[in-house]
Amino acid sequence: MLGVLTHHWAKADKVDEARKLLDHNGEAQSKAPGFVSRQTLLSRSDPTKITTLVVWTTNEIYDTWRASPERAVAMSGADALWSKPPESERFNMAE
């Protein structure tokens, strides 16, 4: 299993819009083959930081999602919401 931890920093005046976009993306992810689960974490120290942890069955399945037209639609306009580029890292899930 693969865990993908991604930090997003929304522009201060776009936090609500950014959360809605990420929630919409999560809904789209949940319909994709190989999706397992998704959690959204909100930073206690930085109100603009939204982190997601998404679990997929395999690295290849996640790569397929990243290249999908469904993801492109779900994340359309996202770049205008971030104060800096998102940072993502892939992890093996411990059993």
Where are these regions (language model features)?
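Absolute protein N-terminus
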Residues: M1-L2, E95
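Short, surface-exposed ligand-recognition loops at beta-strand->loop->(often short) alpha-helix junctions
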Residues: W9-L21
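Short, well-ordered beta-strand segments in beta-rich or mixed alpha/beta enzyme
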Residues: L2-H8, Q39-R66
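Generic structural motif
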Residues: K11-D13, N59, M93
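An amphipathic, aromatic/His-enriched active-site/gating alpha helix that lines ligand/cofactor pockets
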Residues: H24-V36, V55-E89
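Flexible, low-complexity linkers/stalks enriched in Thr/Pro that connect modular domains
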Residues: L41, E89-A94
